[in-house]
Amino acid sequence: MCSSDLDNEIVIATILRAGLPFHQGFLNYFDDAQNAFVSAYRKSKKDGTFTVKVEYISCGSLEGKTMLLVDPMLATGSSAALVYEALVEKGGMPAHTHVASIIGSEQGVDYVQRHMPHATTSLWCAAVDEELTSRSYIVPGIGDAGDLAYGEKL
């Protein structure tokens, strides 16, 4: 992060369920940060494709702040981009956004770079895998981050 980013108030934003453990890790470091939460999920279609549905947003003002959008997996990138748009619509434009993921795919990285404001977005991935399955899961990846943290959904 740039030192100027640290001069701004920090907001840690995450996508509910899968992102909560990652969110807590960032909050342990940025302990004075504000929080933002978004409920987003994949709505599968019969043909195997999906759309991302955003249903719940909880955030204060993002205007002029540094937002850390933390999502453990950046598969297609569409969830991160849609969540960013929803947060900006509700909370205003942050001065800078850092998207942080543990694992991304080449497709997800490319999508975020094309669909989020280039001048005010930084993307951080610990690893970038080359491949997605036909269901848009990262290969080899780590599996479903939410299921790993909380157990399989019923």
Where are these regions (language model features)?
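Short glycine-rich phosphate-binding loop at a beta-alpha junction
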Residues: 7-15, 98-100
